[in-house]
């Protein structure tokens, strides 16, 4: 009870927190709800070739409210990543990278969430997810025995679903532990705020004002997920229709399109001529997030309002550039697209490098 009280009730926060500081609470609740809904689905899922697709279909048709739980779990991960991207952008804009351990643990949560979402995407054994796993399996072949350990063989086969199901169960538990560490270091070092000014007279308890604000926001988000599950009003969150077809190893889709939150990395793989180059570029984009932490050594005063012009001109164009990169991931590969995609990837690297460089000159 003392731990609950110190971190959720009596925890002191700045008075000037705005809507951007609700994203972390939303992500925590969505993660717990994903674990609960995933646990419910695991009671009926059979990780075997042929049976995986049939068991998923049986949940949709034969289990009371099974369709809602399955669709909630499917769309919940889209909302989870949507708010995670907003949370990362908030951290970049308001210099949260100057809280190093919070940023490091956040990057670990992001990477583990991507891995969890990918293996979960493969589990229904649909046509699109099967060939998506085949593409990733081809990228990891040079890891040798590690690839066999993860996929159960050199290619995607019956053992792959069993391995992926185990990974999909274990990784959320690890993420939850990292989230607890993330909260610990955040509350130990203190929350950031829009002005980045620590004034002991301008703080108050997390409960009730901020807590009720977070609860109100998460209720709205859960209602949106419910409406999305019933009506599918956000088309980009919908899965590809080919994933509603049982996987066929002898029939390759005309174009492989992963879930929208994986498009950034898939586009990075597409625009490079070799698998190794694409994989290194994808790892490099994640490494840039880590390098943002090291920019804290370049200046002692953290300021979000008195920012240098270079910081604004680097962070604002980064958003449409990332949208362009994601759009390229949905397109069919051709020579012109590769040229455009290469320019977009270089632009992402350039803008983040400018963020690093501008940290030296921000006031």
Swiss-Prot record:
Binding positions for a ubiquinone per the UniProt entry: 187
GO terms of molecular function: metal ion binding; ubiquinol-cytochrome-c reductase activity
UniProt subcellular location: Mitochondrion inner membrane
GO cellular component, one term: mitochondrial inner membrane
Functional note: Component of the ubiquinol-cytochrome c reductase complex (complex III or cytochrome b-c1 complex) that is part of the mitochondrial respiratory chain. The b-c1 complex mediates electron transfer from ubiquinol to cytochrome c. Contributes to the generation of a proton gradient across the mitochondrial membrane that is then used for ATP synthesis.
The record's free-text note on cofactor binding: Binds 2 heme b groups non-covalently.
Keywords: Electron transport, Heme, Iron, Membrane, Metal-binding, Mitochondrion, Mitochondrion inner membrane, Respiratory chain, Transmembrane, Transmembrane helix, Transport, Ubiquinone
TM stretches of this protein: 23-43, 67-89, 102-122, 164-184, 210-230, 271-291, 310-330, 332-352
Binding site for heme b b566: 87, 182
Quaternary structure and interacting proteins, as annotated: The main subunits of complex b-c1 are: cytochrome b, cytochrome c1 and the Rieske protein.
UniProt topology in membrane: Multi-pass membrane protein
Sequence similarity: Belongs to the cytochrome b family.
Cofactor(s), names only, from the UniProt record: heme b
Species whose genome carries this gene: Theileria annulata
Database matches in PROSITE patterns: CYTB_CTER (PS51003), CYTB_NTER (PS51002)
UniProt protein name: Cytochrome b
Keyword Transmembrane annotated: yes
Coiled-coil regions listed in the entry: none
Listed GO biological process terms: mitochondrial electron transport, ubiquinol to cytochrome c
Amino-acid positions noted as binding heme b b562 in the UniProt annotation, renumbered to this chain: 73, 168
Highest taxon above the source species: Eukaryota
Miscellaneous comment in the UniProt entry for this protein: Heme 1 (or BL or b562) is low-potential and absorbs at about 562 nm, and heme 2 (or BH or b566) is high-potential and absorbs at about 566 nm.
Pfam families the UniProt entry points to: Cytochrom_B_C, Cytochrome_B
